[in-house]
Amino acid sequence: MRVAKIGVIALFLLMAIGGIGGVMLAGYSFILRAG
């Protein structure tokens, strides 16, 4: 599951750079459901 972990890290980095809290929460909840 290393590929998935890298994808999650990439998403978090993009979200952090964007600074969009709503997207971060939505992405985090999606990751929890997908995982």
Swiss-Prot record:
Q: Where does this polypeptide localize?
A: Cell inner membrane
Does this UniProt record's set of keywords contain Membrane?
yes
Coarse class of the protein's main subcellular location: membrane
Q: Where does the sequence pass through the membrane?
A: 6-26
User: Superkingdom of the source?
Assistant: Bacteria
Q: Which UniProt keywords apply?
A: Cell inner membrane, Cell membrane, Membrane, Transmembrane, Transmembrane helix
Which GO terms of the cellular component aspect does the record hold? plasma membrane
Q: How does it sit in the membrane?
A: Single-pass membrane protein
Which family is this sequence assigned to?
Answer: Belongs to the UPF0387 family.
Per its record, how is this protein called by name?
UPF0387 membrane protein YohO
Q: Which organism is it from?
A: Salmonella typhimurium (strain LT2 / SGSC1412 / ATCC 700720)
| Protein encoded by which gene | yohO
